[in-house]
Structures are given as structure tokens and as C-alpha cells.
């Protein structure tokens, strides 16, 4: 089911991006999200994703009733192929699954998840090795990127349910093996992963896939 979503993200052309505002100090160190206000706009909001500035990725994250709803619906509910950043509908919304998948369009104007393409270069990862997920419980989780790959939309990296520890270990090994470079970041059976997925310029079946491991959780704004 999630693989059909990644296929659906393939046929995207240049559109204007949309972003709802969180608030932050200039360096991003005291970024905060008003989820009550966001829910008044869209009750499907479950998180906010942010990369270190000057990154463009700084968006609300929703979860629809299925994995097609937000392919062409903006956060404010308008029909537009820019869509919205969204969590796999079959994950739990609290980011406590072993692997939670977040999808976003590759917009040719540089918005949404276009910027993930820059992680194809290890030098970019060295500058910006982490991203942040803010949740309605008032916390922010830091994820350290351990793998960046260009994969097919049927890749094992899209697995989000695991029968046992061995299946999860196989997933971790597969994601490390598919990485374009060695990050040296360690993962194990107690890890919790967030996978970011977007399209590429290479072809309709290819995806840029970025895997991050949760390394810290703390109250947002501290």
C-alpha cells in the first residue's frame, strides 16, 4: 500500500509550495509549534518537520484516512498537486513505530521535499546530519540521518511492519546497504526510524529515501 503512494508521487510538475507558520528564533533554537491553531485549520495535523536553517523543509505533517488523500490536497484543503507532507496512513501517528514513513512531493521550485536531493552528496549530510519532528505532546525528537539512497519504489526501505527483531534487523541492514555513502551512524533493534521519501529526476520508479534514527527527545523550545 505504501509503495503505491510512492508511485503516486512520481508525476509531479512545477507548482507553488505552501507552508503554515511555526515560530522560531533566527537560529531555530527555540522553534515552537501551535498545534491548537493548526488543528483549527486542519484536524489531520500530527506533527511538524523541520531541518536546520537555511533549509526550506519546515512544514506541518498530516495523516489522511488513506495514502492518496494528501497527494493533491494542501494543508488548507485546496486541490493542488503540491499536496501536503504526510505520514503513511498505516503508521501510528505518535511516531513510536519502528519505522514511520513520511512522504512529500519533489517540487521543481525547490519546495516540499525537493531539498532531500541535496543529501545525495555526503558533504551536504556532513553539514546538516539531522532533522526534527515536533509533536502535539510538546516534544521535539531529533533524528540523525544514517542512510541516504536512491531506490526503487518497491524497496525494503518502505517496510513499516515487522514480524520480529530479525525482520527489523534485515530492514536496517538493507537500508544501510542501499545508502549512497557510509555515515557511520549506528542503528540497532532498539532504534526508532523515520523514513523520508520523495521522487527523483532519474525516473518514475526511483525515489530518494532518507532514513533517520531517533537520538533525542526533549520539550520543544528549550
Question: Can you annotate each of these PLM segments?
Answer:
Residues 43-46, 54-56, 80-82, 95-99, ...:
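Extracytoplasmic
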Residues 76-158:
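Mid-length scaffold segments of soluble, non-membrane domains
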Residues 44-45, 54-60, 66-69, 109:
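Primarily extracytoplasmic ectodomains and periplasmic/lumenal surface modules that are beta-strand-rich
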Residues 102-106, 117, 144-147, 152-195:
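Surface-exposed beta-strand/loop segments enriched in Pro/Gly
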Residues 2-13:
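Single conserved hydrophobic/aromatic residue that forms the stacking wall/gate
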Residues 59-76, 161, 213-215:
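Short Gly/aromatic-enriched secondary-structure transition segments
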Residues 11-44:
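N-terminal low-complexity, Pro/Thr/Ser-rich intrinsically disordered segments
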Residues 130, 177-222:
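Extracellular/periplasmic metallocenter environments
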